[in-house]
């Protein structure tokens, strides 16, 4: 929650597996965006295959939250994407980065946060042509003219376990050398921020 209160649009949280990154991000989106403000969230993975897996009970990203809090938040496949439901109420959507071209006409006026889970590819995964540019296109699709209309920008919250400083997103945002220096110092959590970017290594 405190990271979003900075109003910085691009937030990257990188750390070891099992540190609660996805859990905390989704719980905050549900409590703050959905319940408090009647808004929706957009959950994203790199590939369509990863997104489809989320629709199974085993890989539902809300699985542990449901268990811990007695919720019933379920993803359902819908026309090439997925939607998240709390009972019968749609509370969010899901998209793969590889499907960005399919949703450029999407109207996401009711969405204030994009949660990009596992944004750094695993070592064994293939590189994606135009990965960072596709992400920028998606952000523009969701954000549109909000700031011109007097609204705060959409928050793009990116989460990852893999610690590859030379990933496509860091290269695009000119964060490679910054992340490498943070890692060399070896003091965690480590944080870097400016007006548009916040990077937290844990």
Where are these regions (language model features)?
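Phosphate/NTP-binding elements of NTP-utilizing enzymes
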Residues: 1-202
